[in-house]
């Protein structure tokens, strides 16, 4: 795993779930790792695909977001998503069509 992919994952976690507790951040990190694994693409390719994940380059990554990225990348604990490759914030958007799949 290259340093750019690791940094991008930590930045994505902080951008998408910066205000969530650690378990939420870990879940978001696992979603990206799962998507890369399932698609056979690199993590960097998955993270930089248009309109998939928010990555705010102006943010300073918190320790907990960086830790969550390390947990998912190194599979330091069981995947709390059960292998999910998508997530959504129910407080931000209505239930997406793929939710029940």
Label for each model-derived stretch:
Residues 3, 7-101:
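Bacterial extracytoplasmic/cell-wall-associated proteins, especially those involved in peptidoglycan
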């Amino acid at each position: 795993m290259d340093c750019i992919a690791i940094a991008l994952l930590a930045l994505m976690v902080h951008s998408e779930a910066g205000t969530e507790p650690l378990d939420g951040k870990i879940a978001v990190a696992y979603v990206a790792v799962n998507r890369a694994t399932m698609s056979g693409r690199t993590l960097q390719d998955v993270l930089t695909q248009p309109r998939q994940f928010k990555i705010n380059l102006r943010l300073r990554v918190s320790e907990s977001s960086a830790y969550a990225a390390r947990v998912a990348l190194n599979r330091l604990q069981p995947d709390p998503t059960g292998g999910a490759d998508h997530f959504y914030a129910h407080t931000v958007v209505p239930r997406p069509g793929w939710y029940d799949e």
